[in-house]
Swiss-Prot record:
Organism for this UniProt entry: Lodderomyces elongisporus (strain ATCC 11503 / CBS 2605 / JCM 1781 / NBRC 1676 / NRRL YB-4239)
Record's function text: Component of the NOP7 complex, which is required for maturation of the 25S and 5.8S ribosomal RNAs and formation of the 60S ribosome.
GO biological process: maturation of 5.8S rRNA from tricistronic rRNA transcript (SSU-rRNA, 5.8S rRNA, LSU-rRNA); maturation of LSU-rRNA from tricistronic rRNA transcript (SSU-rRNA, 5.8S rRNA, LSU-rRNA)
The protein's name: Ribosome biogenesis protein ERB1
Major location (coarse): nucleus
GO cellular component: nucleoplasm; PeBoW complex; preribosome, large subunit precursor
Mapped WD repeat ranges: 481-520, 529-569, 658-700, 703-741, 744-783, 787-827, 843-874
Subunit structure: Component of the NOP7 complex, composed of ERB1, NOP7 and YTM1. The complex is held together by ERB1, which interacts with NOP7 via its N-terminal domain and with YTM1 via a high-affinity interaction between the seven-bladed beta-propeller domains of the 2 proteins. The NOP7 complex associates with the 66S pre-ribosome.
KW Cell membrane (keyword) present: no
Length: 874
């Protein structure tokens, strides 16, 4: 009965019934699922989805559920619209519904069009039904539901599932163009989900937050909803918040949300652990048991248990060769078999008597073999009971002990014993044997063939000394008065006054002809300063100034002795005092002259302007010019010019230059405005160039290699000669370059001197040598003279017109030579020894310390360690 009533309904009401049945079915399914979840306790990870399932989908769209609901609503609305159109209804949208002004008109239209059969009460009667009727009614509803599903969804099948597999909850539909569309179920956030505790995140991307300053919102969340700007409190609220800081307050503002940025308890705990250097991850155990990967026990692995190579099982060719050699030696008899060795041993035991030297013969020495020289036989003084004349007295023993071991005639003292058994062991036997072994090892023997040459023919033909006069031959005057060693002396340009400096700290000036002392200045007080003494002094080459430069310790004193006339003394003092004004007001112009400038002076004018700018930084001689706009800093760094006090002015001192280290040598430029000083212990400031007219002192070198021993100016060229311990360098002051490097080939140079013509140089060394360098030839010496027995202290050319030079040594002897330099460059200089002058005493192995030639005469002045100065004349 129920089936007939359902089938008898009008076709126009079928869609409406289907929609109603679909809604009822959906509500029933939802209610059933809710009850099932309560009963069975469905886990939070399961999803309850109604829709189509596409197992092949991989997408993960979070808005799939919302899209599904919207699609179902659109389908329902479309069904309702189609149903209304079938009934003749004209309403299609929300705007059309506004045309009905009242409910009466709407009800009237519905009453006219609706069929009473649509609202039939069949199946909903309150009367009791039989069991068969109830079953028929249920079958009718089931058929209606099936029909509704077929009509509403067509080919799409609806499945209601409650499963845990997310891939089976996907909905598979199509877009308007027919392409497949996959809708995944919405994720239900639970406690373990990543998004369960996440706040609304601003998804504006790379758009700056400043773009939302004039808008009430600050961006959009993941669902496209606006994130409203948080309300800002008043100034009072902000003050209260700053006073009562909430938990996790940082004072920072989140740019994405506009809300204050807070730190959680977990983040605070993490920060605390980092500050306390604790373990930040509780799951990590810092004290895990040690796993010793590398042990002493060898592990059997492919690296050590490799298969044996084939070559170990193949006979070796090299072993075969060695075996063949052994076989050959056995056949030749060089190797005996055990049987033959036993037989030979038995024969030897039978022959007991044999000649030890039977098969030996004298082997002649090799032709190049040189036997060691035999020791000299002992003399009478080496006897244990020598004659009385060989024994030394107390005075001779004391003299023998004071001598240097190298200078002793014998290395033992003869002693007398009554019997041979009383002679003790010789304590120097091991040392003498060791020294002899060193001599044989370090001094190889050489076989020399004797030449049958007349020795007289080897001596060059030299002119007679009588033909080379004048030269000094005798001591005419002795200048006595100093109590210490006279280390230096100098003669004034006119040749009238001799200045000497001694270890007693005094400078004395003597009259040359009479030997009378005319002036004395005590520059060093030996009671307060016993280490300093007069090291060097030299007169200014300008005879009109009368200036004497004295080096005492670290100071350089410029004196004008009151022995000249008023005019000369006044000129010298004014020359020194003019520099004080320059030092006060500074330099206002460049010292370097511009190339191409019209200069009226000779080459020396440029030299004087450019000497103080010479700089050499390496052996290649590439110098760098120092700036001269302001030379005061350089002067203050290397030396300091000091105005003397009243007591020093009374001694004739006009200026004092204070250096860093002890000044050993001083040399004037021929113009008299510049002078160079040498301080060997001052390293890079060992060489200083001082300018008298400007009171300037500067170091021309940034660094120096080796210890500087002496420095001289060229007689007329803008060149500077600097001598270190082993080499001599020549610098061009105009071009700021290194011109030449001389290699004397000695260990320790003492001093140098230049020939007045400037093309030859003399050098003296502490290893008893005098070297003559020709600057036009090679860097090695032209002549090396070895005639002194001890260190050569000084060597000097005659600065006048006489071809003389002399050398002084610690042996107390002065050698005078004739040295002629020819104008022809193809002719070698002529060197002739003239005279040996001896008169100074040797004190503590120190003899003559300094010599100087008279500027005009062939006179020689010398200073010795005996405290005297001597004049040697013709």
């Amino acid at each position: 009965m129920a089936k007939k009533e359902v089938s008898a309904s009008k076709p126009g009401n079928t869609k409406k019934d289907n929609v109603l049945l679909k809604k009822r079915k959906q509500q029933a399914v939802e209610k059933e699922e809710a009850e099932k979840e309560k009963e069975e306790g469905v886990s939070e990870d399961e999803f309850n989805v109604q829709g189509l399932i596409d197992p092949e989908s991989d997408s993960d769209d979070e808005g799939a559920a919302a899209a599904e609901e919207e699609e179902e609503e659109e389908e329902q609305q479309q069904d309702v619209k189609e149903l209304d159109l079938d009934k003749g209804e004209v309403i299609s949208s929300d705007s059309d519904a506004e045309d009905f002004d009242s409910e009466e008109e709407l009800n009237k239209l519905l009453g006219e069009e609706d069929d009473p059969s649509d609202y039939s009460s069949v199946g909903f009667s309150d009367e009791p039904k039989e069991d068969g009727d109830e079953q028929d009614e249920q079958d009718a509803f089931a058929a209606a539901d099936a029909a509704t599903d077929d009509d509403a969804f067509g080919d799409v099948k609806l499945k209601n599932l409650s499963i845990t597999d997310p891939s089976k909850l996907e909905v598979r539909t199509k877009f308007s163009d027919g392409t497949p569309r996959i809708i995944k179920p919405e994720i239900e956030p639970v406690y373990d989900s990543d998004d369960s505790d996440a706040e609304n995140f601003n998804t504006i991307g790379n758009i700056p937050i400043s773009a939302y300053e004039e808008m009430p919102h600050i961006g959009y969340d993941i669902n496209g909803k606006r994130i409203m700007r948080p309300a800002k409190g008043s100034a009072l609220d902000q003050l209260l918040e700053s006073i009562d800081l909430p938990q996790g307050w940082t004072g920072l503002l989140d740019q994405n949300t506009g809300a204050p940025l807070k730190i959680t308890d977990e983040e605070l705990e993490l920060i605390r652990k980092i500050q306390q250097q604790e373990n930040t991850d509780e799951n990590i155990n810092p004290y895990e048991p040690l796993n010793d990967w590398f042990t002493k026990n060898q592990e059997v692995m492919p690296l050590t248990a490799v298969p044996e190579p084939k070559r170990r099982f193949v006979p070796s060719k090299h072993e075969a060769k060695r075996v063949m050699k052994i076989v050959k030696a056995i056949r030749e008899g060089r190797i005996l078999t055990p049987e033959k060795a036993k037989e030979l041993k038995e024969k030897e035991t039978e022959e007991m008597n044999y000649d030890l030297w039977q098969n030996e013969s004298e082997v002649p020495d090799h032709i190049m073999n040189l036997r060691a020289p035999k020791l000299p036989p002992p003399t009478n003084e080496e006897s244990y009971n020598p004659p009385e004349e060989y024994l030394l007295n107390e005075e001779e023993k004391q003299k023998w002990l004071e001598q240097d071991p190298v200078d002793r005639e014998r290395n033992f003292i003869p002693q007398k014993y009554s019997s041979l058994r009383l002679v003790p062991g010789y304590q120097d036997s091991v040392r003498e044997r060791f020294e002899r072994s060193l001599d044989l090892y370090l001094a190889p023997r050489l076989r020399k063939n004797k030449l049958n040459i007349d020795p007289e023919s080897l001596i060059p033909e030299l002119p007679s000394p009588k033909d080379l006069r004048p030269f000094p031959i005798k001591c005419s005057t002795v200048y006595e008065g100093h109590t210490g060693k006279i280390r230096t002396l100098s003669i004034d340009p006119q040749g009238l006054w001799l200045a000497t400096g001694s270890d007693d700290g005094s400078v004395r000036i003597w009259e040359v002809l009479t030997g009378r002392q005319v002036f004395k200045a005590q520059l060093v007080n030996k009671e307060h300063n016993g280490e300093d003494h007069i090291e060097s002094l030299e007169w200014n080459p300008n005879a009109q100034t009368g200036i004497l430069a004295v080096c005492a310790g670290e100071n350089i004193y410029l004196l004008v002795p009151p022995i000249f006339g008023f005019e000369i003394e006044n000129t010298g003092k004014l020359r020194i005092e003019s520099g004080w004004g320059y030092d006060t007001f500074g330099n206002t112009k460049q010292d370097l002259k511009v190339k191409g400038e019209d200069t009226k002076g000779d080459l020396d004018d440029d030299e004087e302007e450019e000497e103080e700018e010479e700089d050499d930084d390496d052996d290649e001689g590439q110098g760098k010019v120092k700036a001269h706009n302001s030379t005061a800093p350089a002067k203050k760094d290397v030396a300091k010019w000091i105005n003397p006090n009243s007591s020093q002015q009374a001694m004739g001192i006009s200026a004092i230059i204070q250096c860093r280290r002890t000044v050993k040598k001083i040399s004037w430029h021929r113009k008299g405005d510049y002078f160079v000083t040498v301080s060997p212990d001052s390293k890079n400031t060992a060489v200083l160039i001082h300018q008298l007219s400007k009171h300037l002192s500067q170091s021309p070198f940034r660094k120096s290699k080796g210890v500087i021993m002496d420095a001289k100016f060229h007689p007329f060229k803008p060149q500077l000669f600097v001598a270190s311990q082993r080499q001599i360098k020549i610098y061009d002051l105009a071009q700021q370059t290194l011109l030449k490097k001389l290699l004397p080939g000695v260990r320790l140079l003492s001093t140098i001197d230049l020939h007045p013509r400037g093309d030859n140089l003399l050098a003296a060394s502490y290893d008893k040598r005098v070297l003559w360098h020709d600057l036009d030839l090679a860097a090695t010496p032209y002549k090396t003279l070895r005639y002194h027995e001890k260190a050569v202290r000084q060597i000097k050319y005659h600065k006048g017109s006489l071809p003389l030079f002399a050398s002084a040594s610690d042996d107390g002897i002065i050698h005078v030579f004739h040295g002629t330099v020819y104008d022809d460059l193809m002719t070698n200089p002529l060197l002739v020894p003239l005279k040996k002058l001896s008169g100074h005493k040797v004190i503590n192995q120190i003899g003559v310390l300094d010599i100087v030639w008279h500027p005009k005469e062939a006179w020689l002045f010398s200073a010795g360690a005996d405290g005297t100065a001597r004049l040697w004349t013709t």
